[in-house]
């Protein structure tokens, strides 16, 4: 039960981290706004809440020496995936701090990237936070105060990573994956190909392909005849 709960929380953390990464890339662009900065704050705070919950649920089993080898291996895989999410979150938070400092909202500015996209990314953030919609209630000086808060949260995430490494020693290179990298993407792609495979095979072996083959043969014969005729004319001249 604890393992399934950890998997569900880790899946939610993956979504929140991916959403935060997507939102960070729009800072300084034509879609940047105070609403975007508020969505960034809510998304990263949601990710941190999930991270705290996952850490508590993973630390206890991994420190339990009576845990079976198979169960321990599964929890170690979850731990490595969790550590990777935290590293990405910390890197994106540092990137958000740098971009937000470079492009403050209260000063006249030119968009960093004119993507042609207008409006915020409320829908993306709402899906990651598992809510229907986001309410924007930030005041005018929100971005200035948020920068200081973001600095503190970056330190907190860094301390969390260090604390995890001290309490649970799971070197990433010792954890073996159950499947090859990108296996999920390959399996979904192969499933899509197999669903249309029957149609494509029938199309290749149908009468339409035979007529195309005949036309190609006739065209090749005409081309060879034209080349031979040109050679003969050249010799006679």
Swiss-Prot record:
<dbReference type="GO" id="GO:0009968">
    <property type="term" value="P:negative regulation of signal transduction"/>
</dbReference>
<feature type="transmembrane region" description="Helical; Anchor for type IV membrane protein">
    <location>
        <begin position="215"/>
        <end position="234"/>
    </location>
</feature>
<keyword id="KW-0844">Vision</keyword>
<feature type="topological domain" description="Cytoplasmic">
    <location>
        <begin position="1"/>
        <end position="214"/>
    </location>
</feature>
<feature type="coiled-coil region">
    <location>
        <begin position="29"/>
        <end position="58"/>
    </location>
</feature>
<dbReference type="GO" id="GO:0007186">
    <property type="term" value="P:G protein-coupled receptor signaling pathway"/>
</dbReference>
<keyword id="KW-0175">Coiled coil</keyword>
<dbReference type="GO" id="GO:0050908">
    <property type="term" value="P:detection of light stimulus involved in visual perception"/>
</dbReference>
<keyword id="KW-0812">Transmembrane</keyword>
<feature type="region of interest" description="SNARE-like">
    <location>
        <begin position="153"/>
        <end position="202"/>
    </location>
</feature>
<dbReference type="InterPro" id="IPR026512">
    <property type="entry name" value="RGS7BP/RGS9BP"/>
</dbReference>
<keyword id="KW-1133">Transmembrane helix</keyword>
<keyword id="KW-0734">Signal transduction inhibitor</keyword>
<keyword id="KW-0716">Sensory transduction</keyword>
<feature type="coiled-coil region">
    <location>
        <begin position="144"/>
        <end position="169"/>
    </location>
</feature>
<comment type="subunit">
    <text>Specifically interacts with isoform RGS9-1 of RGS9. Component of the RGS9-1-Gbeta5 complex composed of RGS9-1, Gbeta5 (GNB5) and RGS9BP.</text>
</comment>
<dbReference type="GO" id="GO:0097381">
    <property type="term" value="C:photoreceptor disc membrane"/>
</dbReference>
<comment type="similarity">
    <text>Belongs to the RGS7BP/RGS9BP family.</text>
</comment>
<keyword id="KW-0472">Membrane</keyword>
<comment type="function">
    <text>Regulator of G protein-coupled receptor (GPCR) signaling in phototransduction. Participates in the recovery phase of visual transduction via its interaction with RGS9-1 isoform. Acts as a membrane-anchor that mediates the targeting of RGS9-1 to the photoreceptor outer segment, where phototransduction takes place. Enhances the ability of RGS9-1 to stimulate G protein GTPase activity, allowing the visual signal to be terminated on the physiologically time scale. It also controls the proteolytic stability of RGS9-1, probably by protecting it from degradation.</text>
</comment>
<dbReference type="GO" id="GO:0120200">
    <property type="term" value="C:rod photoreceptor outer segment"/>
</dbReference>
<dbReference type="GO" id="GO:0043005">
    <property type="term" value="C:neuron projection"/>
</dbReference>
<protein>
    <recommendedName>
        <fullName>Regulator of G-protein signaling 9-binding protein</fullName>
    </recommendedName>
</protein>
<feature type="topological domain" description="Extracellular">
    <location>
        <begin position="235"/>
        <end position="237"/>
    </location>
</feature>
């Amino acid at each position: 039960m604890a393992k399934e709960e950890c998997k569900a929380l880790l899946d939610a953390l993956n979504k929140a981290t991916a959403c935060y990464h997507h939102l960070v890339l729009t800072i300084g662009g034509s879609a940047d706004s105070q609403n975007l900065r508020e969505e960034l704050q809510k998304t990263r705070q949601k990710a941190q809440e999930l991270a705290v919950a996952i850490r508590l649920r993973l630390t206890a089993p991994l420190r339990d020496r009576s845990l079976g080898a198979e169960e321990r291996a599964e929890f170690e895989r979850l731990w490595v995936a969790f550590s990777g999410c935290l590293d990405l979150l910390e890197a994106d938070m540092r990137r958000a701090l740098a971009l937000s400092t470079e492009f403050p909202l209260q000063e006249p500015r030119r968009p960093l990237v004119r993507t042609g996209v207008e409006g915020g990314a409320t829908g993306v953030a709402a899906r990651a936070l598992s809510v229907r919609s986001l309410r924007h209630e930030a005041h005018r000086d929100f971005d200035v105060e948020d920068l200081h808060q973001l600095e503190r949260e970056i330190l907190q995430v860094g301390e969390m990573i260090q604390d995890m490494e001290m309490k649970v020693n799971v070197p990433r290179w010792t954890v073996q994956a159950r499947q090859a990298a990108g296996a999920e993407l390959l399996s979904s792609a192969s499933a899509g190909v197999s669903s249309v495979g029957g149609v494509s095979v029938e199309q290749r072996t149908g009468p339409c392909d035979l007529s195309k083959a005949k036309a190609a043969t006739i065209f090749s014969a005409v081309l060879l005849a034209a080349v031979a005729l040109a050679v003969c004319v050249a010799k006679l001249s």
